[in-house]
Amino acid sequence: MTAQNENAQAQAEQVEVANEAQLEQTAEVQQEQPVEAELAAAYARINELETYVAEADNREKDIQLRAQAEIQNIRRRAEQDIEKAHKFALEKFSKELLTVVDNLERGLNALDTAVTDEKTQALVDGVEMTHKEFISTLAKFGVEAVGVVGEAFNPEVHEAISMQPAEGIEANHISVVLQKGYTLQGRVLRPAMVMVAG
C-alpha cells in the first residue's frame, strides 16, 4: 500500500501543481486584461489631451495673429491721424487769413481807380507786393485759390450763385467770380462764389 499511497500522493501532487499552474495562468490572463484595458484608456486620454493641446495652440496662434493685425491697424490709423493733423493743422488759421486776403484785394481794386500821382502809385505798388508775398506764403503751406473765369464749374469747390448767359464762355463754366475760393492741401477751406454761364 505504500507504493499505492506514494503513487496516489504523487498523482495528487501533480494535479495540485497542474491546478496551481492553471490558476497562475488564469490570474496572469486576468491581470493582463485589466492592464490592456487601462493601457487603452491611457492612450485614449493621451490622444484626447494632445488634441486639446493642439486646439489650444491653434487658438493661441489665432489670438496672437489677431492681436498683431490690430496693432498694425492702430499704428496705421495713428500715422494717418498724424499726417492729417500735419496737413490740416493750419485750417482754422488759414480760414481767418482769407478775410485779410479779400480785404487786400478789395483795397487794390479801389486804389486802381484812385491813382492820381506817383506817391499814390508807389503806395499801390507796395500793397500789390504785400499781396503777392502774402499769397506766396499761403501757397507754401498748401493754400491755393480756386475759381477762375472760364474754369469748368465744379460743385465740390464752387458755389453757384446764379446762372446767366455769357458771350465767349461755354455753358457750365464760370462767367463771373464774386468771391475767390481756397483749398488747403486739396480740402476746401471756402468754396468760390461764382456765376455760371448757362
Curated annotation (Swiss-Prot):
Protein location: Cytoplasm
Ranges in a coiled coil: none
Keywords for the protein's UniProt record, in alphabetical order: Chaperone, Cytoplasm, Stress response
Extent of the signal sequence: none
Superkingdom, taxonomy of origin: Bacteria
Subunit structure comment from the entry: Homodimer.
Function summary: Participates actively in the response to hyperosmotic and heat shock by preventing the aggregation of stress-denatured proteins, in association with DnaK and GrpE. It is the nucleotide exchange factor for DnaK and may function as a thermosensor. Unfolded proteins bind initially to DnaJ; upon interaction with the DnaJ-bound protein, DnaK hydrolyzes its bound ATP, resulting in the formation of a stable complex. GrpE releases ADP from DnaK; ATP binding to DnaK triggers the release of the substrate protein, thus completing the reaction cycle.
NCBIfam families associated with the record: PRK14140.1, PRK14150.1
Protein's name according to its UniProt entry: Protein GrpE
Native source species: Actinobacillus pleuropneumoniae serotype 7 (strain AP76)
